[in-house]
C-alpha cells in the first residue's frame, strides 16, 4: 500500500495528475463505470481489433473489469492508455480527423481540443505515465473526489491499524467526506 498520494488538478481540462492512486483504486471507486474502452496504444495486446480506428476495443463491463484486474499483473509491460465510449456504432462514425486526434492524444498524452468527444460520449481518458504517475481526464470531477476520499480513508485505516494484535478488533475509520476534499480543491491546483 502506498504511503503518500500526490495530486494536481487542472480544472480547465478536468485533468488530474496523481501518484499513489492505481488503476484498481480507480476501478473500485467510480460510479460511471465504462461500458466500452478504446485502447489508445496501437500495440496493446488486450482487446479485439476495431478496423475503423485501427485500435483495439474492450466491450462490456465484465471484460473491462477483467482488463482492470489483469492490468495490475502486467504493470511495466503495456502502458494503460484508454478512452471510454458508449456505443460501437458511434465509434465507427468517427471522421479521419477525429481518429487522428485520438492517435495524437494516445501518443502525446495530451489533447489538441477537448478531451471529451461528442460521438464517443466518454467520461474518462486514462494514461499511465512514468514513475507510477497517471493522468486521468474526468468529465465529472466528482468521480475523482470519490476515488481520492476512498484512497485516503484506506491509507488512514491501514496506518491506524498497523500494530493491531490478533485479538484486538480493527479500529474503524470514517470515510473522508467528498465535500471536504472539494473545499480543499485550491490546495491541489497551482
Language-model features, listed with the residues they occupy:
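Structured alpha/beta or helical-core interaction and ligand-binding surfaces enriched in interleaved
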Residues: 1-190
Amino acid at each position: 500500500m502506498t504511503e503518500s498520494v500526490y495530486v494536481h488538478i487542472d480544472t480547465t481540462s478536468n485533468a488530474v495528475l496523481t501518484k499513489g492512486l492505481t488503476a484498481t483504486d480507480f476501478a473500485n471507486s467510480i460510479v460511471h463505470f465504462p461500458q466500452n474502452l478504446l485502447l489508445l496504444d496501437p500495440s496493446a495486446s488486450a482487446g479485439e481489433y476495431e478496423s475503423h480506428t485501427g485500435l483495439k476495443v474492450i466491450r462490456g463491463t465484465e471484460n473491462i473489469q477483467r482488463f482492470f484486474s489483469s492490468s495490475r499483473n502486467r504493470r511495466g509491460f503495456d502502458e494503460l492508455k484508454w478512452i471510454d465510449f458508449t456505443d460501437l456504432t458511434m465509434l465507427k462514425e468517427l471522421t479521419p480527423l477525429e481518429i487522428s486526434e485520438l492517435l495524437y492524444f494516445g501518443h502525446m498524452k495530451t489533447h489538441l481540443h477537448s478531451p471529451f468527444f461528442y460521438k464517443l460520449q466518454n467520461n474518462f481518458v486514462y494514461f499511465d505515465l512514468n514513475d507510477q504517475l497517471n493522468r486521468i481526464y474526468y468529465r465529472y470531477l466528482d468521480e475523482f473526489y470519490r476515488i481520492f476520499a476512498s484512497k485516503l480513508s484506506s491509507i488512514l485505516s491501514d496506518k491506524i491499524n498497523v500494530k493491531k494484535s490478533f485479538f484486538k478488533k480493527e479500529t474503524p475509520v470514517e470515510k473522508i467526506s467528498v465535500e471536504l476534499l472539494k473545499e480543499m480543491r485550491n490546495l491541489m491546483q497551482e
